[in-house]
Regions:
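Short amphipathic alpha-helix used as the core "switch/output" element in two-component signaling
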Residues: 34, 69-82, 102-117, 134-137
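The short loop immediately C-terminal to the conserved phospho-acceptor aspartate in CheY-like receiver
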Residues: 91, 96-98
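Hydrophobic/aromatic residues positioned on beta-strands within the core alpha/beta folds
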Residues: 93, 120-124
Length: 169
């Protein structure tokens, strides 16, 4: 039996980055949309030094990244994506984004527009505990917290897992 799904290209998944710092957007772009050839070279070198076989390539995330630098801008993008029937599957949202609304308010209003979007809230600070965040947002099954500075592997793993989870819903 021919498995056609294996030969079809993976659909592009839409990920929204919401952060007031342009450098953070570039970091996400490097992590989530990277050419993995340098990672393959590192894996090969590691296997030569430490023994064993190099691990396979990172999964093809097939991601379209869209940037918003303030909460209100993010909400406009989410509204348009829903209206165009091309919603975001995942958003990485910073907590502090002066001078506008913060990440908690952004996420709350984002879920009013699109309750299916998966969210990773990102912060370098301890403004809110998990309990406060969960209580405030009331949708913790679609929420993960990522502490800055973030680890490349953790960001990719979160993206892979949450995008797969979105496809199951």
């Amino acid at each position: 039996m021919l498995n056609i799904s294996k030969s079809l290209p993976r659909p592009v998944r839409r990920v929204l980055i919401v952060d007031d710092n342009p450098a953070i957007h570039e970091d996400y772009r490097r992590v989530l949309c990277a050419d993995d050839s340098h990672l393959d070279n590192l894996a090969s070198t590691k296997s030569l030094l430490l023994g064993g076989q190099p691990s396979g390539k990172s999964p093809d995330l097939s991601i379209e990244l869209v940037s918003a630098f303030q909460g209100e801008e993010a909400l406009d993008l989410v509204r348009r994506s829903v209206a165009d029937n091309n919603p975001f599957q995942l958003a990485f949202v910073d907590v502090r984004m002066p001078p506008g609304i913060d990440g908690i308010e952004t996420i709350s209003r984002m879920w009013d527009i699109d309750p299916d979007i998966q969210v990773v809230i990102c912060t370098a600070f301890s403004d809110y505990s998990w309990e406060e965040t969960s209580e405030s947002l009331q949708n913790s099954d679609k929420l993960l917290i990522l502490k800055k500075p973030f680890d490349i592997t953790v960001v990719r793993q979160m993206a892979c897992s949450l995008l797969a989870k979105f496809e199951l819903t």
